[in-house]
A protein has these predicted regions:
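Conserved HGGG/HGGXW glycine-rich cap/lid loop of the alpha/beta-hydrolase fold
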Residues: 17-68
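Conserved catalytic-core motifs of eukaryotic protein kinase domains, centered on the activation segment
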Residues: 42-44, 69-75, 134-137
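Short, hydrophobic alpha-helix immediately C-terminal to the catalytic nucleophile
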Residues: 46, 86, 110-114
Length: 193
């Protein structure tokens, strides 16, 4: 079976790991895709999904390595996210979909659309990254830094420092939401997962 149900959603079995998603409402399908930073998850879309579900079938997805999805020890690339998005639309949604994506997830959505135009109706890009940011080419120092971060003790230490409750609170206040009262406990918990 391709999908597993849990109390809060479903799991889609993809080749590199299980991908968590939610499905609510009925009507035309809409897929909501969160940013690709390490703490991101579909929980970012909770309030929007609730409103859209009144007239649509709304899917939120936790991309591989994020939220309640598996976090395999693999190299995460934009093209991997293209493959996930394409497979998810084909296997789970099963028909053309409207998509909304934020920040770093916008590039894989654009590429998925370029490769499989028949899967997407409308695409909404929220705060997309600039082409200038996307044109960076890895060099030898990038590979060295990646190898250091991939060392279990060092990588785990850095991740734990970056995703501590204090750092996540600062991230929310500085980057995402200027009014602290809008930050739900569920959203914070999703970032800690």
């Amino acid at each position: 079976e391709m999908c597993i149900r849990d109390s809060n959603g479903h799991y889609y079995k993809w080749k590199e790991g299980n991908i968590f998603y939610t499905k609510t409402g009925t009507g035309k399908p809409i897929l909501l895709i969160h940013d690709t930073d390490s703490g991101a998850s579909g929980e970012e879309w909770a309030k929007v999904a609730k409103k859209l579900a009144k007239n649509n079938t709304v899917y939120t997805i936790d991309l591989l390595g994020c939220g309640r999805s598996d976090k395999p020890s693999i190299q995460y690339t934009s093209y991997m996210y293209v493959q996930i998005i394409t497979a998810f639309v084909n296997d789970v949604i099963g028909k053309p979909v409207n998509v909304a994506a934020t920040n770093l997830s916008t590039a894989p959505v654009i590429m998925a659309n370029a490769l499989s135009k028949d899967l997407f109706n409308k695409i909404i890009l929220i705060n997309p990254v600039s082409l200038q940011q996307l044109k960076c080419i890895p060099d030898k120092s990038t590979k060295f830094k990646q190898n250091i971060i991939n060392l279990p003790i060092i990588g785990t230490f850095i991740y734990n420092k970056l995703m501590s409750p204090i750092k996540v609170d600062l991230l929310f206040r500085n980057k995402f939401i200027s009014r602290g009262q809008l930050i739900s406990d569920n959203m914070k918990d999703a970032y800690y997962e």
